[in-house]
């Protein structure tokens, strides 16, 4: 089995662009992303033509992470890390960080750092990352934003002399490779201007300056192997009892430019449970397809508020399905769409579906008070789901507060998070089904 993780010393260090480059030069790549992000997997899929899967111990459990990683492995698995290598939910080393995932799965780590404003000191940085947790196999480094091959040679000599870690190459500074940031991290792949041109430049830089044969050797020789007959590639026992429970049922999923944030494992799990999946566009279609359940995921409805607001036929179709008693699950952007309206930053309000009695007020700042991983408890204060919140909006004009589920943070903070009126479940949390099977049973 060939696999490696590309992890950074911090956010903004260039691991996403270098991950994209490496995914473009290897054949039949299985891409993965540590953490709950939806944006980077979209880039992975654009580049490789294969689905990208999230690896998140908090939301999926250890068995869920193992299952997804082994099940979806192709010729070579490339895992893109999140934030800095050791950054996670707390300051422990078992904190759902990139290092934690790499150690748990037994994959080597290639560390990305930049070469700006340093020379020999770069070795101290690598040594610190190597020594903090010796159980993490840091097998090589790639240096980003290097001014010249001569400068790289200085870095390489210092790192290999003082740390014993191999230098695998470098990427030169190039302003043409900049990709603007938005919300969760990066623009969606379809929105990046001249993305193919940027990738072509990046691919050429990688082919010139990075030792791909050595990376493939590391991926092949230093990854823990597994037996295909092991239970590791079977669904986790805690969700396997739901297999085929919903055979004959149809779930309609919103999928278009406004709604695209779904975990691939969630969609496949719906099929595993027996659902037939149908897709529809709240932007362009006039009605929801014939179904038993409606699922509206996250995205950027605020960017398409006028178009969504003008599609009254779709509003009527969703309301009709609700009145017929069909269950509706809406996450973040989907929840915003079901509200009474979206108020843009400049003050204009666009009418939405009107099933959730509130208005969503867009802001230009991330709502830090509601940011990050959460447990979701029911009215009896029993955990039934795990997810995360990340939104640039707040609620206003809540006419009737029907929130019946509570978000619980690790530091003890709580808040009501999911509106539940009859057969409607709508709120900001993004939920991973592997850690939310009790919630799934209630909703589905």
UniProtKB/Swiss-Prot annotation:
Function: Catalyzes the ATP-dependent amidation of the two carboxylate groups at positions a and c of cobyrinate, using either L-glutamine or ammonia as the nitrogen source.
Stored PANTHER family: COBYRINATE A,C-DIAMIDE SYNTHASE
Positions marked as site (Increases nucleophilicity of active site Cys): 430
PROSITE patterns, alphabetized: GATASE_COBBQ
Protein name: Cobyrinate a,c-diamide synthase
Domain notes for this protein: Comprises of two domains. The C-terminal domain contains the binding site for glutamine and catalyzes the hydrolysis of this substrate to glutamate and ammonia. The N-terminal domain is anticipated to bind ATP and cobyrinate and catalyzes the ultimate synthesis of the diamide product. The ammonia produced via the glutaminase domain is probably translocated to the adjacent domain via a molecular tunnel, where it reacts with an activated intermediate.
Names of required cofactors: Mg(2+)
Enzyme's top EC category: ligase
Domain GATase cobBQ-type, chain residue ranges per copy: 250-438
Stretches of the chain forming a coiled coil according to its record: none
Active site (record annotation): 332
Presence of the UniProt keyword Nucleus in the record: no
Pfam families: CbiA, GATase_3
Keywords: ATP-binding, Cobalamin biosynthesis, Glutamine amidotransferase, Ligase, Magnesium, Nucleotide-binding
GO terms under biological process: cobalamin biosynthetic process
Source taxon at top rank: Bacteria
Gene3D superfamilies in alphabetical order: 3.40.50.880, P-loop containing nucleotide triphosphate hydrolases
UniProt family annotation: Belongs to the CobB/CbiA family.
Catalysis: reaction(s): cob(II)yrinate + 2 L-glutamine + 2 ATP + 2 H2O = cob(II)yrinate a,c diamide + 2 L-glutamate + 2 ADP + 2 phosphate + 2 H(+)
More about this protein: The a and c carboxylates of cobyrinate are activated for nucleophilic attack via formation of a phosphorylated intermediate by ATP. CbiA catalyzes first the amidation of the c-carboxylate, and then that of the a-carboxylate.
E.C. no: 6.3.5.11
Gene Ontology MF, one: ATP binding
InterPro entries xrefs: CbiA/CobB_synth (IPR004484), Class_I_gatase-like (IPR029062), CobQ/CobB/MinD/ParA_Nub-bd_dom (IPR002586), GATase_3 (IPR011698), P-loop_NTPase (IPR027417)
Taxonomic source organism: Fusobacterium nucleatum subsp. nucleatum (strain ATCC 25586 / DSM 15643 / BCRC 10681 / CIP 101130 / JCM 8532 / KCTC 2640 / LMG 13131 / VPI 4355)
Pathway assigned in UniProt: Cofactor biosynthesis; adenosylcobalamin biosynthesis; cob(II)yrinate a,c-diamide from sirohydrochlorin (anaerobic route): step 10/10
């Amino acid at each position: 089995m060939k696999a490696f993780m590309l992890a950074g010393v911090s956010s903004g260090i260039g691991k996403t662009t270098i991950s994209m480059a490496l995914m473009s030069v290897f054949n039949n790549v299985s891409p993965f992303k540590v953490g709950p992000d939806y944006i980077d997997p979209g880039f992975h899929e654009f580049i490789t033509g294969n689905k990208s899967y999230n690896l998140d111990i908090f939301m999926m459990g250890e068995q869920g992470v193992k299952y997804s990683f082994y099940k979806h492995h192709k010729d070579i698995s490339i895992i893109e890390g999140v934030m800095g290598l050791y950054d996670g939910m707390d300051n422990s080393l078992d904190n759902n960080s990139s290092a934690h995932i790499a150690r748990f799965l037994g994959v080597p780590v290639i560390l990305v750092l930049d070469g700006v404003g340093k020379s020999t000191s770069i070795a101290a940085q690598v040594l610190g990352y190597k020594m903090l947790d010796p159980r993490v196999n840091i097998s090589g480094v790639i240096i980003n934003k290097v001014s010249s091959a001569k400068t790289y040679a200085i870095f390489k000599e210092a790192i290999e002399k003082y740390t014993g870690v191999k230098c695998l190459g470098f990427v030169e500074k190039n302003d043409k490779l900049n990709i603007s940031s938005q919300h969760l991290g990066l623009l969606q792949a379809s929105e990046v201007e001249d993305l193919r041109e940027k990738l072509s430049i990046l691919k050429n830089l990688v082919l010139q300056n990075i030792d791909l044969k050595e990376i493939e050797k590391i991926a092949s020789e230093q990854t823990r192997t597994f037996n295909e007959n092991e239970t590791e590639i079977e669904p986790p026992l805690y969700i396997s009892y739901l297999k085929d429970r919903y055979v004959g049922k149809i779930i309609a999923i919103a999928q278009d430019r406004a709604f695209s944030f779904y975990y691939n494992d969630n969609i496949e799990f719906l099929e595993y449970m027996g659902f037939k999946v149908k897709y529809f566009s709240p932007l362009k279609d006039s009605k929801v397809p014939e179904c038993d359940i409606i699922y509206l995921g996250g995205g950027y409805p605020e960017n398409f508020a006028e178009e969504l607001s003008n599609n009254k036929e779709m509003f009527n179709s969703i309301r009709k399905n609700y009145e017929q008693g069909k269950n509706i699950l809406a996450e973040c952007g989907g929840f915003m769409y079901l509200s009474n309206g979206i108020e843009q930053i400049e003050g204009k309000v666009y009418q939405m579906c009107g099933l959730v009695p509130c208005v969503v007020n867009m802001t230009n700042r991330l709502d830090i008070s509601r940011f990050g991983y959460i447990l979701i408890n029911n009215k009896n204060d029993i955990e039934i789901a795990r997810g995360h919140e990340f939104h640039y909006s707040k609620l206003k004009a809540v006419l009737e507060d029907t929130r019946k589920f509570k978000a619980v943070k690790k530091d003890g903070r709580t808040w009501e998070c999911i509106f539940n009126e009859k057969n409607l479940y709508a709120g900001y949390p993004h939920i991973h089904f592997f850690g939310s099977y009790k919630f799934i049973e209630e909703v589905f």
